[in-house]
Amino acid sequence: LLSRFNLITGGMETIKRDSSLAGFGIEYETDYQTYMSRLLDEQLVHPDDADEFRSIMTLDQLRLRMFHEKGSVIYRFRRKFKAGYFWTSLELFPDAECSKENPWVVMVIHESPSVNPDL
């Protein structure tokens, strides 16, 4: 999934969908807060990863990282698909001018090589 993501409004504009990430209709969400709530409430994030995911991926944490530290975020977690949980990467890339006035970042979500085949 390739999207533009607004760190102020939470709006997500999909540029390209990846059919391998399809499942449970979550790939059609356009609001970050709704997307995150569904991932957690529907246990689409593995229960062992949920607390860390919840703390790292809040809009406030992402704004701090993007606006002040000017760093990208790369987070790997186990996400549920119809066939079970698979390692997934969620990556956010700001440009050098990322700020409250220019809050757009690139979001990429893709399958990640498993670091532990037994999950």
Each predicted region: which residue ranges?
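PAS-family sensory domains
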Residues: 75-84
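PAS/GAF-family sensory domains
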Residues: 117-119
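Short loop/turn elements at sensory-signaling interfaces that couple input to output
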Residues: 86-115
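PAS/GAF/H-NOX family sensory domains and closely associated sensor/linker modules
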Residues: 30-57, 61-68
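Extracellular Ig-like/FN3 beta-sandwich strand-entry sites
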Residues: 70-72
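Long, contiguous hydrophobic alpha-helical segments, chiefly transmembrane helices and signal peptides
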Residues: 2, 45-46, 53, 57, ...
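Generic recognition of flexible, low-complexity loop/linker segments
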Residues: 2, 62-64, 76, 94
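PAS-family sensory domain signal
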Residues: 1-44, 96
